[in-house]
Amino acid sequence: MNRVLYPGTFDPITKGHGDLVERASRLFDHVIIAVAASPKKNPLFPLEQRVELAREVTKHLPNVEVVGFSTLLAHFAKEQNANVFLRGLRAVSDFEYEFQLANMNRQLAPDVESLFLTPSERYSFISSTLVREIAALGGDITKFVHPAVADALTLRFKK
């Protein structure tokens, strides 16, 4: 069975992330969205809420599971019996960092392959950072995120 691990901070999960998950769900037997705690990134949403939002966005996909983690990714992949890391590449600028990450992961988890997918062109410009900035300034984010995520962002920035 092919089990793919799609790691990220997902702060918040966007339609670009959702596009990759949908496509991965057709390619793999089981997709695990691995939501990283990432405390050094000082996320807008706590881990539990990011996990819940990812579950809401992907609830229509029966072979997709969402799990939070705060350990080394290579160790988490072994715990989950994953044999593939899935990473998204929006632009050439993403490649250098992702290439380094893939090589490091190969050293730490040699049995887990790294696979890169590019998002659909209509989502290639979306990033969680941009979505947060637009939401913080009161802009319309409904084209970039699932309605539950838009609601969570609106509520978060009303405070």
UniProtKB/Swiss-Prot annotation:
Annotated metabolic or biological route of this protein: Cofactor biosynthesis; coenzyme A biosynthesis; CoA from (R)-pantothenate: step 4/5
Sites where the protein binds substrate: T9, K41, L73, R87
SUPFAM superfamilies: Nucleotidylyl transferase
Family matches, as Gene3D superfamilies: HUPs (3.40.50.620)
Function: Reversibly transfers an adenylyl group from ATP to 4'-phosphopantetheine, yielding dephospho-CoA (dPCoA) and pyrophosphate.
Subunit structure: Homohexamer.
Protein name: Phosphopantetheine adenylyltransferase
Organism: Pseudomonas fluorescens (strain SBW25)
